[in-house]
From Swiss-Prot:
CDD domains: IF2_eIF5B, IF2_mtIF2_II, mtIF2_IVc
GO MF entries: GTP binding; GTPase activity; translation initiation factor activity
Record PROSITE patterns: G_TR_2, IF2
Gene name of the encoded protein: infB
Entry protein name: Translation initiation factor IF-2
Source organism (scientific name): Neisseria gonorrhoeae (strain NCCP11945)
Length: 943
């Protein structure tokens, strides 16, 4: 390190390069740039030059910059002036010391002080310490005057400690810059410990004042103003603490009064919210003796903060307070960190909260609800609901769903009122939609349902009206599906519904959808009133719709219309020409006789009913029929009841929804809209809806999807509940119970009397263990719907004088559904009785096979006791059950472990022969005991 550059040497001396180059030129060393190298001789020349120029006493230049700040505290202007700072410029001796240190590399390059410089520094430090001690003494006096005599010892001891500390601080290092922030607690404590040691000066010197009298006066004035400001702040703080203490007392008194009033009102005590404790009220109210050590520590902290803490706010010092903080009563929390951000409270904020009554919410709880939604309804945090559920033994998360009963219990536990919410009823939604859309009601065509007994000519009558041959397309000539048609007549439009039976009609009536306005009751003139006809009359009367009787097949020679009128009169269907209200029309579907008169009678009934429906409104209707087409997907026949159905509408039908992609009428023609009472085929639903489902047009897909998914969940829950008993895990539980087995039967007969008699006879066969469950009974052939019902329920089908069509037989063969045909009712009863007998649990009986006498007992180690026996009666078999009888008392019942004769294992031993045997798990046998051998035989039971 003998050769260094000018730039490096300037950095070591902490001098600008230009100044150093100038001084080198003045010393006779020619250097032009900072990159030129300096030798040891060059440095010595520079040192000699500076020593000659400045002398040994030069080197300290005081640069002071005063800054005055004016602050306003509660209307009082306080002027504070910041002290200047001293910048030390190294002298020639210090430069020489730095050069020497660079050569030896024994210590970092630091300007060394000579003895004379050290004396000067100590004198300056002593003067500053004395001035600071004076300021502290004045501040302590002012503080003592305000707070009383309790702070006098605490103010005197820190002053003495500070006076002792000053020489040591001056001896160890020069005055520190003002930028340093407040030191940590442990550093202050360490400084205090060092202050207790007596400081010995290095050399005796007379301290000389380094500041002028004017500057000293300014410093004294500044210290006095700071002490006055601090005393004023402390007085304000004390006053605020007293006010806060009074508020605390008032709050506690108000809480006690509110608590007493609540107890008197409710009769039970609720735990009140604990009030927050005041943090700064205790020192202002209580006059406790001050600990001298604590007072000394606090005063030392205040002294350290006096010069530096005043600017701590602007410099991010931790723990510093400014005047605004003191004005707010000290309620400003300082968050640790680099920037020292502060979380400010409002100036008038306090811990007092007025007692309020607990808010009780009325919570509507749906069938399922998540924990988060339940907490939101009660206006509590989700953690509280999770805690309540955990106390009930349920480990749940905030996103987990709980059932309605559990949610109601949680609501009650948390002090609120829980009520089960009404289900998302589609009917209610329809009502809201109807109220929202008010459209003018216009006349609509009547909807007519054709009912009657099988083969009485319902479909043939509709064929003639429609001028089509629909019957030829049906398998076996029997109507299997519901058909919907509308016919235009000179007097208006009529919509017809053709049904194979009464089931679909009954389902419509049960749901309250008024799909039918008028019923045409078709009765064959040559057959008379049949049970199905009577049932149709009952359904029409239950629905409250008028009846028009069409007496068909009057073209036959055996036709007797008058007999039909007489028979119907017995069922309260009285012709209008006999003084009743029912129109009777004699027609012939084959020849078309009086068809126009029948349509005229239907339109006359429609005029009396004054049928109207809104047209300019969202459509709603009922699903008449639905199927899954291979090429087109879900196809549904919809009967529009209100409004106008348009292509592109969003339709909801049961659990199915979708945008209508195509609309086709009954003739196969594509249409774009359909008004009230018009049946159409629609395409575009997401799934096949059930027949009889209500359909409605919604505004958007979101609402339709929401309701459809809700219904799917409801139907799924119902389905799972029904299947619960048949699950594998519950099967053994059901076996343990004495539940009766069920034999499910579907009965289809030619006439109502036949299936009623057959159903009644089968139900009489029911016993305690086996019951007959007639799932469905009806008149007509076996259809695909019957086979599907049998597949779903595990039933078999009885056909009494009827047969299944080709499609039904094929479906039954593929799904292994048993179909039995009978012509005699007793054969059907006997077969069902035999099937029920097979379902009965067999009866177990004991059959004694032989008797054995024990004549000798042989004990064999590690084997047990072996009985030497004689078969006295019957046969003893190896797998026989035995009873050990001693003195005519049964001692043990069990099985044989082994059966031998002459050391050979045998399967049986007959009477009169000897044998040896062992009992399984039993050795307590004696000579003279009797063994009774028996077998358990299962005997089939009969009804």
């Amino acid at each position: 390190m003998s050769n260094t550059t000018v730039e490096q040497f300037a950095a070591e001396l902490k001098r600008p390069v230009e100044d150093l180059l100038k001084q080198l030129k003045e010393a006779g060393v020619s250097k032009n740039s900072g990159s030129d190298s300096l030798t040891l001789d060059d440095k010595q020349l520079l040192n000699a030059y500076l020593t000659k120029k400045n002398g040994s006493n030069g080197g300290t230049i005081s640069i002071r910059r005063t800054k005055t700040e004016v602050s306003t505290v509660d209307g009082v202007k306080v002027e504070t002036r910041k002290r200047g700072r001293t910048v030390n410029i190294p002298s020639a001796e210090e430069l020489a010391a730095q050069v020497k240190a660079a050569q030896t590399q024994a210590a970092p390059v630091q300007p060394e002080q000579t003895a004379e410089d050290a004396v000067k520094a100590r004198a300056e430090a002593a003067a500053r310490a004395e001035a600071r001690a004076k300021a502290e003494a004045e501040a302590a006096k002012l503080k003592a005057a305000k707070a009383g005599n309790k702070a006098k010892p605490a103010a005197q001891k820190p002053t003495e400690a500070k006076a002792e500390t000053a020489p040591v601080a001056a001896e160890t290092k020069p005055a520190e810059p003002k930028e340093k922030a407040v030191k940590p607690k442990h550093e202050r404590n360490g400084k205090g410990k060092d202050a207790k040691k007596p400081a010995k000066p290095a050399a005796p010197a007379v301290p000389q004042p380094v500041v002028s009298a004017e500057e000293q006066a300014q410093r004294d004035e500044e210290a006095r103003r700071a002490a006055a400001l601090r005393a004023h702040q402390e007085a304000l703080l004390k006053e605020k603490q007293e006010r806060q203490a009074r508020r605390e007392a008032m709050k506690q008194q108000a809480e006690q009064q509110a608590k007493a009033a609540q107890e008197a009102k409710t009769g039970r005590q609720r735990p009140a919210k604990p009030a927050e404790k005041p943090q700064a009220a205790a020192p202002a109210v209580e006059n406790k003796p001050v600990n001298p050590a604590k007072a000394k520590k606090e005063d030392r902290r205040n002294r350290d903060d006096e010069g530096q803490g005043r600017n701590a706010k602007g410099k991010g010092a931790k723990g510093g307070r400014d005047r605004n903080n003191a004005r707010n009563g000290g309620d400003e929390r300082v968050r640790g960190g680099k920037k020292g951000k502060k979380l400010k409270l409002e100036p008038n904020q306090h811990a007092f909260q007025a007692p309020t009554e607990p808010v009780v919410h009325e919570v509507l709880v749906p069938e399922t609800i998540t924990v988060a939604d339940l907490a939101h309804k009660m206006a509590v945090k989700g953690v509280e609901v999770v805690k309540a559920l955990m106390k009930m033994g349920m480990m749940v998360t905030i996103n987990q769903s709980i059932d309605q009963d559990t949610a109601l219990i949680v609501v009650e536990e948390l002090g609120h009122i829980g009520k089960p919410a009404a289900a998302d009823d589609p009917e209610a939604f329809l009502g809201e939609g109807a109220e929202a859309v008010e459209a003018e009601a216009l006349p609509r065509p009547p909807v007519v349902t054709v009912m009657g007994h099988v083969d009485h000519g319902k479909t043939s009558l509709l064929d003639y009206i429609r001028r089509a041959k629909v019957v030829q397309g049906e398998a076996g000539g029997i109507t299997q599906h519901i058909g919907a048609y509308h016919v235009k007549t000179p007097r208006g439009v009529i919509t017809f519904l053709d049904t194979p039976g009464h089931e679909a009609f009954t389902a419509m009536r049960a749901r309250g959808a008024k799909a039918t306005d008028i019923v045409i009751l078709v009765v064959a003139a040559d057959d008379g009133v049949m049970p199905q006809t009577i049932e149709a009359i009952a359904h029409a009367k239950a629905a409250g719709v008028p009846i028009v009787v069409a007496v068909n097949k009057i073209d036959k020679d055996t036709a007797n219309p008058e007999r039909i009128r007489q028979e119907l009169t017995q069922h309260e269907v009285i012709p209008d020409d006999w003084g009743g209200t029912v129109q009777f029309i004699d027609v012939s579907a084959k020849k078309g006789t009086n068809i126009d008169a029948l349509l005229e009678a239907v339109l006359l009934e429609a005029e009396v009913l004054e049928l109207t429906a809104p047209v300019d409104a969202p459509a709603k209707g009922i699903i008449v029929e639905a199927r899954l087409d291979k090429g087109r997907g879900a196809v549904a026949t919809l009967l529009v009841q209100n409004g106008t159905l348009k292509k592109g509408d969003m339709l909801l039908a049961g659990t199915a929804f979708g945008k209508i992609r195509a609309m086709v009428d009954e003739n196969g023609k594509s249409i774009t809209e359909a008004g009230p009472s018009i049946p159409v085929e629609i395409l575009g639903l997401s799934d096949v809806p059930n027949a009889g489902e209500d359909a409605m047009v919604l505004a958007d897909e979101k609402k339709a999807r929401e309701i459809a998914l809700f219904r799917q969940g409801k139907y799924r829950d119902v389905r799972l509940a029904k299947q619960q008993a048949a699950k594998l895990e519950n099967m053994f539980n059901n076996m343990g119970e004495t539940q009766a087995q069920s034999l499910s039967v579907i009965i289809k007969a030619d006439v109502q009397g036949s299936y009623e008699a057959l159903a009644g006879s089968l139900k009489k066969l029911s016993a305690d263990e086996v019951k007959v469950n007639v799932l469905h009974s009806g008149v007509g052939g076996i259809t695909e719907s019957d086979v599907n019902l049998a597949i779903a329920s595990g039933a078999f089908i009885i056909g009494f004088n009827v047969r299944a069509d080709a499609s039904s037989r094929k479906l039954a063969e593929n799904e292994n559904v048993e179909i039995r045909y009978y012509n005699i009712i007793y054969d059907a009863i006997d077969d069902v009785k035999a099937a029920m007998s097979g379902m009965l649990s067999p009866e177990k009986k004991e059959q004694v096979t032989g008797t054995v006498e024990i004549r000798q007992v042989i004990s064999v180690s590690k084997v047990g006791n072996i009985a030497g026996c004689m078969v006295t009666d019957g046969v003893v078999k190896r797998d026989s059950h035995i009873r050990l009888i001693r003195n005519n008392v049964v001692i043990h019942t069990g099985e044989l472990a082994s059966l031998k004769r002459y050391k050979d294992d045998v399967k049986e031993v007959r009477m009169g022969f000897e044998c040896g045997l062992m009992l399984k798990g039993y050795n307590e046998i004696m000579e003279g005991d009797q063994l009774e051998c028996f077998d358990i035989v299962e005997v089939a039971r009969t009804l």
